[in-house]
A protein has these predicted regions:
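The feature marks the mature, well-folded catalytic cores of soluble enzymes
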Residues: 1-281
Length: 281
């Protein structure tokens, strides 16, 4: 069995930055909570919890003396206002790429542009981005939605940072035809594009493709979609225990990639389990 691990697998810059900030708080014994799970990976969230960093869903759950950490997905301006009004200290771990989108949205919407976000309406990053708009917001998950929407005459279009480029491009084609005055900003994260391109290449050359990551992670699910287009035997593995004993045959080419919220220690554990299973077959 030949095993290959993608060079771009695992934590992206924004997630790595947020996790480091959280563990720094734990080391300093600073009472700190994250507003929502810091990352979409249950194993890493549990590791943070054991270090003393718990997750809350609302500001009402924050105890006196605790600091709130904003996760890499970012939040709406209203969250910052509420924290200030309640006297809650904030550590802002919003990914700089996401923060840049916030500023674009605020700037263009203040000048009268509607805002089109290509992404998933219920994703926390998209919810946060939409909150920075001062006017009309359209959230379009795909080209079909773009065809059906009552679009404005003038708009800024941005992308959820983890959206697949082909999906963004398909929506963009519709917008170019239907929105006369369109400002385009391709805000897909470079790391996301690199990871997806690498996953395409690896899955096209592999007999078995393993995507390591949380089942609730949007970018992990998108990686799995990408891999399944080129490799029928593509599987999602959240923990080493999820690795099927009969995953691969002795002469199979196996490739691994991981979502942006997947820590390298977990990727290594999955790799070790695959190799261990191969030895016992």
């Amino acid at each position: 069995m030949k095993l290959t691990i993608g060079e771009h697998a695992g934590f992206c810059f924004g997630v790595r930055r947020a996790v480091l900030k959280a563990f720094e708080c734990a080391e300093k014994q600073l009472p700190c909570v994250t507003l929502g799970p810091l990352i979409h990976n249950p194993q890493e969230v549990e590791r943070l919890r054991r270090a003393g960093i718990r997750s809350v869903e609302t500001l009402d759950e924050v105890k006196p003396g605790e600091t709130v950490m904003i996760r890499s997905h970012g939040v709406t301006p209203d969250v910052y206002r509420q924290c200030e009004a309640r006297g809650i200290p904030v550590i802002d771990a919003t990914c700089p790429h996401v923060a840049h989108i916030h500023q674009l949205v605020r700037q263009y919407s203040e000048h009268g542009d509607a805002v089109v976000i290509v992404g998933e309406a219920d994703h926390p990053e998209v919810v946060g981005i939409a909150g920075w708009a001062r006017g009309r917001v359209f959230i379009l998950p795909d080209a079909q939605a773009a065809e059906q929407a009552e679009l404005p005459q003038k708009a800024l279009v941005v992308a959820q940072t983890t959206i697949r480029r082909d999906r963004f491009d398909s929506v963009l084609q519709v917008l170019r035809r239907r929105v006369p005055d369109l400002t385009e900003r391709i805000t897909i994260c470079a790391a996301t594009s690199q990871r997806q391109q690498e996953a395409e290449k690896l899955s096209g050359e592999a007999d078995v493709m393993v995507v390591v990551g949380g089942r609730n992670s949007s970018n992990t699910q998108k990686l799995l979609e990408t891999c399944r287009l080129r490799c029928e035997r593509s599987v999602l593995v959240e923990t080493p225990e999820d690795v099927p004993p009969d995953l691969a045959e002795a002469d199979d080419r196996v490739a691994l990639t991981a979502g942006a919220s997947t820590p390298l220690w977990l990727l290594e554990q999955v790799r070790a389990r695959i190799e261990e299973n191969a030895k016992t077959r």
